[in-house]
């Protein structure tokens, strides 16, 4: 379906078809699920409010994606111009999470699985907060500019790639367990 503004409000939202719209506002009491064959293409802004977002689709936002979601599991392709994920309880990425501009994530628990990509065209800030927080990266976390990983109350486990291409990489953690690559200022 094609529309200018698409608003949905339901106990659960399951998207399995194709959605093309200028703006989208999805509000669910429980879950927002995008299924494997779905396409969600938003040319401007998207706002998501739910207990959890489970993305298995191609989900594109042309401008800014904001969320009031407790948990995000990205198993596919989530792309936008700018992302702010604040006050998450859990973020698990097994796919591609891409921001053309800045990417900011604040979550209690973060896991970027092997072969997963968390990419930012500019600055990428990833922080953990709360009790029982954790940071595990087995994939690729790459910022075209600066990369800040602030997990000062938790251990940072990296078996993948942490990379700031053009600027500084700042990693603050209780303990750092690195068997992967940590690279900054390569100017590639």
Regions found by a protein language model. Give the residues of each.
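Surface-exposed loop/turn motifs in large extracellular/passenger domains
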Residues: 2-11, 22-30, 42-51, 62-70, ...
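Short, T/G/N/S-enriched strand-turn elements that build extracellular solenoid repeat scaffolds
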Residues: 1, 14-20, 34-41, 54-60, ...
């Amino acid at each position: 379906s094609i529309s200018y503004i698409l608003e949905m409000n339901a106990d659960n939202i399951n998207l399995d078809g194709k959605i093309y719209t200028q703006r989208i506002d999805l509000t669910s009491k429980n879950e927002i699920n995008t299924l494997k064959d779905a396409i969600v293409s938003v040319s401007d802004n998207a706002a998501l409010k739910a207990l959890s977002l489970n993305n298995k689709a191609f989900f594109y936002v042309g401008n800014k994606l904001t969320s009031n979601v407790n948990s995000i599991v990205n198993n596919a392709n989530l792309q936008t111009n700018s992302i702010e994920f604040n006050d998450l309880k859990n973020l698990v990425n097994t796919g591609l999470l891409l921001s053309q501009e800045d990417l900011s994530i604040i979550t209690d628990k973060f896991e970027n699985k092997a072969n997963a990509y968390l990419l930012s065209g500019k600055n990428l800030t990833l922080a953990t907060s709360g009790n029982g927080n954790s940071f595990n990266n087995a994939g690729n976390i790459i910022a075209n500019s600066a990369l800040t990983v602030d997990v000062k109350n938790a251990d940072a486990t990296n078996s993948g790639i942490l990379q700031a291409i053009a600027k500084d990489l700042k990693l603050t953690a209780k303990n750092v367990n690195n068997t992967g690559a940590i690279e900054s200022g390569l100017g590639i």
